[in-house]
Amino acid sequence: MAYRDDTYSGGFSQPVFDSQSTFKQVMDAMARPGSIAEITVAATPPAPMGPAAGAIALTLADHDTPVHLSPAMIEAGVQSWLAFHTGALVTDDRNEAAFAFVEAGGQMPPLSTFATGTQDYPDRSTTVVLELTALAGGEPLQLVGPGIDSAMEIAPSGLPQHFDCMWRENVALFPRGVDLILAAGTKILCLPRTTKVTKKGA
């Protein structure tokens, strides 16, 4: 594996503290689907991986958690950066990945190609981190489900075409299914598999 100059930089300055802080912020966001949260700890991975996605990768990935990266991220050196800072192994098999990362504007694979867990072990599934251009300014979507009072509206910009249909198929697998973290810059928005998504007015 070739290492580049940016392989060794951009990690957490205080790995234990920074990982704990980021983990709490991600878990809080996952418990409040649709809410936009700020990842306050700095991480500077090689582009096109953004700072929030980078901090999440540093926090959640290790030698026991296979990670899937988009081809653009591998080409940009994210695989080497992740290996140096976390020891995580990158897998080409999306069904083996504990976590997956797709850059903004990248080709989002069908969610069904990731690990969706089993009826007995639904937690053995992939958490997908999808980067977007922004978490606002897109087509309005309505969310309902646990952690949401009545209903909530979001409007992420840059979601895959027919995302609502893709997500509906994922929700139908419950308790199986993938969980999704949308990231833009230093901000995230979480969609656990329990959250139903519909186009506003549909």
Across the structure, where does each feature detected by a protein language model lie?
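N-terminal, charge-rich interaction modules
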Residues: 1-66, 70-73, 84, 185-187, ...
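Internal, well-folded beta-alpha domain core
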Residues: 75-190, 195, 200-202
